[in-house]
């Protein structure tokens, strides 16, 4: 079902990140009123965002408060989660702290966001999670990262069925490697040499176009 974004209230979690900022900008350009949930509001683009709430996504209580805060200003029509962390290395190099961090940010946090926002999102709205291509095409040397993203993808797929009666689209976006610089900020390991990825602006534009068009899934092929 196609949707109009003009005047709609969309919450972008991670709007200070490279990709999150571009998504917020494209949403604003499409006429949406964009709220941000971030850890550091000083890095926000004031031209794209009209309000913000502070939260670390691995703090479920803070996430709940943040969603309630932005919803108190205007009903929520959609949510986009653009947060994530990455790690590299073989399975023998994986330590407990890295494993816990990957699943906390990439799997548990999106599920908590969906739990806290599901009752706040208006019927006919949407929730977008960026899991990435590794969710369905796991990569050697990135086993835990791939698994954490696959867990989020599975949850999004299940909840999409739960919210179908309310016509809420739960969209899992699985773009290929994107030049966000995330690989240089890995929580562990060193990134292997990668081919040049997509630009963040191209990925952000495609995601916003999918929201407007009412697409329900964005596999890697959708970014070709």
What does each of the following model-derived ranges do?
Residues 16, 24:
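N-terminal Rossmann NAD(P)H-binding glycine-rich loop of SDR-like oxidoreductase domains
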Residues 82-88:
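Conserved NAD(P)H cofactor-binding loop of Rossmann-fold oxidoreductase domains
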Residues 90-91, 98-100:
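Substrate-binding pocket helix/loop in short-chain dehydrogenase/reductase
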Residues 92, 139-143:
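Active-site loop immediately N-terminal to the catalytic Tyr-X3-Lys motif
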Residues 114, 148:
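Active-site helix of classical SDR
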Residues 132:
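Residue(s) in the substrate-gating loop at a strand-loop-helix junction
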Residues 172-173, 188-224:
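C-terminal helical subdomain
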């Amino acid at each position: 079902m196609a949707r109009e974004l003009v005047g709609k209230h969309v919450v972008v979690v991670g709007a200070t990140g490279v990709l999150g900022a571009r998504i917020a900008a494209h949403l604003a350009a499409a006429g949406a009123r964009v709220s941000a949930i971030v850890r550091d509001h000083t890095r926000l683009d004031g031209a794209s965002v009209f309000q913000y709430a502070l939260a670390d996504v691995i703090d479920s209580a803070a996430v709940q408060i943040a969603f309630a805060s932005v919803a108190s200003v205007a009903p929520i029509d959609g949510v986009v989660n653009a947060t994530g962390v990455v790690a590299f290395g073989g399975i023998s190099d994986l330590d407990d702290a890295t494993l816990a961090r990957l699943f906390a940010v990439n799997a548990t946090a999106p599920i908590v966001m969906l739990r806290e926002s599901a009752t706040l999102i208006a019927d006919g709205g949407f929730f977008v999670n960026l899991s990435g291509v590794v969710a369905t095409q796991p990569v050697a040397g990135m086993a835990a990262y791939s698994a954490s993203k696959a867990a989020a993808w599975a949850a999004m797929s299940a909840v999409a069925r739960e919210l179908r009666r309310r016509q809420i689209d739960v969209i899992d976006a699985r773009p290929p490697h994107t030049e966000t610089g995330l690989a240089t900020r890995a929580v562990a390991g060193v990134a292997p040499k990668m081919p040049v990825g997509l630009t963040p602006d191209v990925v952000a534009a495609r995601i916003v176009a999918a929201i407007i068009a009412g697409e329900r899934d964005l596999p890697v092929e959708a970014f070709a």
